[in-house]
């Protein structure tokens, strides 16, 4: 049985393991701590048998919700876990009065785009712009 709940610091290593298994970079504790000061209720884990198997992280700026990261351990994919996590996150956005949720999908991620479209997320022709505010260290 899948249980969805809010992230706790005791989950950090398990969440990093899910991100790593899913091919994602881990967020450093300091970066995560900053995120958790804003909207900790939008950082969710899915667990089964006491094991964290998936994670979703969102944020709400008062105008729009953003789904920042979704990852499911590869051994637990295609079981509906991601859909459960997203629906719970959407419910939490709604309870905050959030009128719209956005997310970014990499252009070469056809499977990811297909997943989001099945949940009603539609592509927009927006252009993403980015500017580093600190120089990268070699």
Give the ranges of each region predicted by the language model.
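Acetyl-CoA-dependent GNAT
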Residues: 2-69, 73, 86-88, 92, ...
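Loop/helix-junction capping segments adjacent to catalytic residues or to phosphate/diphosphate-binding pockets
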Residues: 26, 79, 110
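Conserved beta-strand-loop-alpha-helix junction that forms the acyl-donor binding cleft
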Residues: 74, 103-112, 130, 134
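Conserved acetyl-CoA-binding loop-helix of GNAT-fold acetyltransferases
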Residues: 78-91, 118
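Conserved GNAT acetyl-CoA-binding A-motif
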Residues: 93-105
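Residues lining the SAM
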Residues: 104, 119, 127
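Short acidic, glycine/proline-enriched helix-loop-strand junctions
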Residues: 111, 115-124
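Short, charged/polar, Gly/Pro-enriched secondary-structure boundary elements
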Residues: 136-138
